[in-house]
Amino acid sequence: MRQRFVDSLDFWRYLFERFLADQGPKSAAALTYTALFAVVPIMTLIFVVLSVVPDFQGIGEQIQGFIFRNFVPSSGAVLQDYLRTFIEQARHLTWLGVGVLMVTALLMLMTVEHTFNTIWRVRRPRRGLSSFLLHWAILSLGPLLLGTGFALSTYITSLSLVSDPYALAGARMLLKVMPLLFSTAAFTLLYVAVPNTAVPLRHALLGGLFAAVLFEAAKGLFGLYVALFPTYQLIYGAFAAVPLFLLWMYLSWMIVLLGAELVCNLSASRRWRRNPLPRLLVLLGVLRVFHQSQQSGQAVRQPDLQRAGWALPDSVWDEMLDFLEREQLICRVSDGGWVLCRDLNRYSLESLLSRSPWPLPHLDQLPESLDEPWFPALRSALERLQRERAALFGDSLANWLQPPLSEP
């Protein structure tokens, strides 16, 4: 029980260290700046897409009201009137103007994707058609899914089971938790679809729930702060809603990125422990998988390593690929896998150690046991190396710095 508690503390410590190392606050500020220019275009595109479907007429107003009512603190009510005016004016734009709005929205989505790829250590971002199709799907199918969800919720609310004064308590509770469910679904979809890598659905769901709960808590605390400390109203007067809205957007992006870090690091089984496995041992384990696959004429992919007992995070897998490809030990094949392109019978361990960016581990860094056939020989060699090192360099430092003069 105590070990599990210590592991949990280590995990959250590592998570926040990664968040700061990935410049989460700086990325949240950049996304806030980008989103500031994309709020009106995205809301306008939602109206435009929903207006294409006759059954969704008028749902855009419901979506806008729902967003400001449940996802923005009460201080955003004044700003909502301004945005509604801007959106009404933008809805009368020509198709050329709508195209400009769409480009603005696409730029924000590209910024989000770049930030997520940085968190997931993705080496190859989407390019060309695949990137355009993803962003187009979000901008076109997203409003339709929102409209369908709101039409369904409106229908459920109209049922006597919910709207009747004697409605079931469970039905009323469902309506109360709907914002949390919508937030969880939105965050989960964001974490699954945007990074250019395979994200386990259960990890994305846990991260989505974490971000949604944190989002609701932050909304309540933010509203409480605005009510108890009305400093912004005293300084900015009628314009107080603008800096408050910017601050809220910044906090929201911080939560989104922190949830992304959680999703990314849920698969990092070893990285957050205080005594992680030395990276050189991981490299030898990966090379053994490549060597075995070469004997059977098979290419290696990341799931093959997981089946062999090496569940590497994407960042570690990418580091291994970078080094092995740079040393011309592996090469990529047409189907996306990797194969050895060098005869390991003609490549010594000494050559690997001299070129590896990861140092030879000390004995106290080795695990007590490791299910690898090469591990006992490596431990024995390190023990012998340590004894020889102690014999060679065991003399006092004073004698090394000022050796005795040799007799004539």
UniProtKB/Swiss-Prot annotation:
<protein>
    <recommendedName>
        <fullName>UPF0761 membrane protein Avin_36810</fullName>
    </recommendedName>
</protein>
<keyword id="KW-1003">Cell membrane</keyword>
<feature type="transmembrane region" description="Helical">
    <location>
        <begin position="132"/>
        <end position="152"/>
    </location>
</feature>
<dbReference type="Pfam" id="PF03631">
    <property type="entry name" value="Virul_fac_BrkB"/>
</dbReference>
<keyword id="KW-1133">Transmembrane helix</keyword>
<feature type="transmembrane region" description="Helical">
    <location>
        <begin position="174"/>
        <end position="194"/>
    </location>
</feature>
<keyword id="KW-0997">Cell inner membrane</keyword>
<dbReference type="InterPro" id="IPR023679">
    <property type="entry name" value="UPF0761_bac"/>
</dbReference>
<feature type="transmembrane region" description="Helical">
    <location>
        <begin position="209"/>
        <end position="229"/>
    </location>
</feature>
<comment type="similarity">
    <text>Belongs to the UPF0761 family.</text>
</comment>
<feature type="transmembrane region" description="Helical">
    <location>
        <begin position="238"/>
        <end position="258"/>
    </location>
</feature>
<dbReference type="InterPro" id="IPR017039">
    <property type="entry name" value="Virul_fac_BrkB"/>
</dbReference>
<keyword id="KW-0472">Membrane</keyword>
<feature type="transmembrane region" description="Helical">
    <location>
        <begin position="92"/>
        <end position="112"/>
    </location>
</feature>
<dbReference type="GO" id="GO:0005886">
    <property type="term" value="C:plasma membrane"/>
</dbReference>
<feature type="transmembrane region" description="Helical">
    <location>
        <begin position="33"/>
        <end position="53"/>
    </location>
</feature>
<keyword id="KW-0812">Transmembrane</keyword>
